[in-house]
Amino acid sequence: MAGLEVLFASAAPAITCAQDALVCFLHWEVVTHGYYGLGAGDQPGPNDKKSELLPVEWNSNKDLYVLRYESKDGSRKLLVKAVTVENSMIINVLEHGSQQVSDLTLNLNDYIDSEHLVDFHRVYKNSEELRSRIVSGIITPIHEQWEKANLSPHREFPPATAREVDPLRIHPQHPHTSRQPTWCDPLGPFAVGGEDLDPFGCRRGGMIVDPLRSGFPRALIDPSSGLPNRLPPGAVPPGARFDPFGPIGTSPSGPNPDHLPPPGYDDMYL
């Protein structure tokens, strides 16, 4: 573990608890994987500088350690947070580029001897296991996700036009184009019987007349039919779907003469 003893010697005067010793080990492991320490805290400060040593005030808060790192080639930045919870330490690492997060929980009593904090040769227990857990739980997941993000191809899509993205656009029912369709207009009002005149042409109206599209004026339906009085103007809006109150064609003025029986219809001798 070349370099860890030198790092511990430089930080030994500030190490006063088990979590300090564990963060020192964690810092060394991150540095050996190609990173420089930048500083302490979430945000960059005026005293930030790339260094393999622990930054100033790295352990000012014994319950929450926040350290920032940058790879030697400047392509990756890490934000490391270590939270002390009773006899455990929860380590959380965020890689800014890929937003990949990894975390690891360590038991302080399993790896740190609190009785020998100033003795480098006795302070760390199971150091190989500790190193393996840091690498597999934090370093490797961060690097794998970062490499995967760089290898995946970036798909580029052409910019969408206003016609494509307008959700309120109503498609025309009969768009007028310069090129006319090869079929005839089925809505032509005078197409009745056209197929009989030109059997080899396109299909047109047959012998069944559509009363709504016959081309002749239609009688208006009186909405007041069946009522003693007429409805006031505007009671039925133009074009509204409306069922008359009574039979169509009746008039409140009285029956039509055609509706009366002929004179003497009941005289058998007439």
Swiss-Prot record:
Keywords: Acetylation, Cytoplasm, Endoplasmic reticulum, Methylation, Phosphoprotein, Proteasome. GO terms for molecular function: endopeptidase inhibitor activity; proteasome binding; protein heterodimerization activity; protein homodimerization activity. The modification Asymmetric dimethylarginine is found at R218. Residues 254-264 have a biased composition (Pro residues). It comes from the Eukaryota. Monomer and homodimer. Interacts with FBXO7. This is Proteasome inhibitor PI31 subunit. The lineage of its organism: Eukaryota, Metazoa, Chordata, Craniata, Vertebrata. The gene is PSMF1.
